[in-house]
Amino acid sequence: MAEITAALVKELRERTGEGMMDCKKALTKAGGDIEKAIDDMRASGAIKAAKKAGNVAAEGAIAIKDDGKAAVIIEVNSQTDFLALQDDFKNFVAASVEKAFADKLTDVAPLIEAQETARLVLVGKVGENVNIRRLKRIEGDVVGSYLHGNKIGVVVTLKGGNVELAKDIAMHVAASNPEFLFPSEVSAEAIEREKSVFLQLNEDKIKGKPAEIVEKMVGGRITKFLAEASLVEQAFVKNPEIKVGDLAKKAGAEIVSFTYFKVGEGIEKPVDNFADEVAAQLAAAKQ
């Protein structure tokens, strides 16, 4: 029996896309013979699913489960938007968020582990990669959520108020995507960058103007920037006459937090060359 070295495990992982522990188990069972391990994994159906792990999954869905006091929000990715609309994928997402909520999970790793068998079955059936990407559990005095087409999900927590108010504010967050809750959370560096950009863009307008006038112009831009970036300072989408922060105060509530998930956020999608894609399809058709 050949020694099961880290290098051997790494090679099998690179060739199959399977996890380190699964590769080690397969090599042990195969007596250290990597080719036999691959054959065994193919026979079990594991590789058919895992080989697709190299494909970028940047589409998918956001799902939320809440009960007014707690919520779980997850992102599950697929390679194509078409799959994200299919019942098999939707059922997997629904089962995953139910599991996460029922088990009060606060980290995505246990959910990935718990759903791995179901994921492999799904991948083997649909022929493309599927990943549970992230999860967050939120608890509070009042918790409300909003889903926009399963592509954007928001959870808002309040101190005071009610679930309907939290849902309204969550809907606003989905539409406006604020960076911060309060203006005080905006870093000095961000403000300085905004000042610098403003001065560069308006170089001709401020040339020759007194320093105090320039200062007022910059101050006006920063005030607008803070209003655009901070949830409590934004005009409420349902009634632009009132700020979101004032809306909450009027209802005797305080906004404690918001969580915003968007499908594919931060995932680098491959840019396909259309000509190459057509050429590849024509070549495949001739075989």
UniProtKB/Swiss-Prot annotation:
Keywords: Cytoplasm, Elongation factor, Protein biosynthesis. Gene3D superfamilies: 1.10.286.20, DNA helicase RuvA subunit, C-terminal domain, Elongation factor Ts, dimerisation domain. It comes from the Bacteria. Residues 80-83 are annotated as: Involved in Mg(2+) ion dislocation from EF-Tu. One of its GO terms (cellular component) is cytoplasm. GO terms for molecular function: translation elongation factor activity. It is found in: Cytoplasm. InterPro entries: EF-Ts_dimer_sf (IPR036402), Transl_elong_EFTs/EF1B (IPR001816), Transl_elong_EFTs/EF1B_dimer (IPR014039), Transl_elong_Ts_CS (IPR018101), UBA-like_sf (IPR009060). Pfam families: EF_TS (PF00889). Associates with the EF-Tu.GDP complex and induces the exchange of GDP to GTP. It remains bound to the aminoacyl-tRNA.EF-Tu.GTP complex up to the GTP hydrolysis stage on the ribosome. Belongs to the EF-Ts family. HAMAP family: EF_Ts. This is Elongation factor Ts. It comes from Pseudomonas syringae pv. tomato (strain ATCC BAA-871 / DC3000). The gene is tsf.
